[in-house]
Amino acid sequence: MQLADRIDFMELISVSGANPNGDPAKLGMPRTDSRGFGVISPVCIRRKLRDRLSEMGECILVSPSGSRGDVIARRASALAPGRDYTARACEKWYDVRAFGQVFAFPELHAPGVKGAVTIQQTYSVLPVKITEMKITRCIRNTDDRRGTQMGSINFVEHGLYVVKGSVNAYSAQKTGFSAEDAEKLRLALLRMFDNDSSAARPAGAMEVERLYWWRHSSMSGEYSPGRVFRTVEIKADCADPRCFDDYTITNSALPGLVPEIYGR
């Protein structure tokens, strides 16, 4: 079924003892802005959503098994070229019609796709404290016999992060992003950290606490996304919150626009 109305969403993510998104420019340390607030890039969020959607059976172009550019190029080029290439690409790959794609590959000349789903930069509610833990490597990969080598693990002690995004109904009509696709996106948001554990993100260290899902009654929406997001107010109950229960979260619904709330 065609998506006829705009959707806005906001997700609250708790982080405890994990690195939610490493910064390659800072040796993989958790991302922060100039004020010390934790940051998760939209690319990171989309990667996790792609992984969950792939597990749900959706066909994904930029998948983990083929994240190298040449592999993705071969996969994209396998679809027969033609004037309707972008339409067929949107029909085949969920992430193309959802997030868009630039087909900048050799021997493939096709217009780019503007996706229906946009996700903002994700920030923590308060500045985060990053802890560095020193570790040793006992297995040497050289002939150096001086003993063990030192390394480090960096993690956020605690942070509550806020993901904000929207589904543009006008773009959805162009890419074929349907109401059923939107429902799959909602489920993927709720399952974002399923099967996502690693040394940097131990199981249970990152959790989706709550999802606000606003369904407008028109393609343009009754209110701007910024005004919708401001209806959710988050305040810490103490100077040093350590868990989700240390926050008070209120929602002042706008007339004619009441969110669906998932989680606790």
List each language-model region with its residue ranges.
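RNA-binding basic/glycine-rich loop and surface signature characteristic of RAMP-family CRISPR effectors
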Residues: 1-264
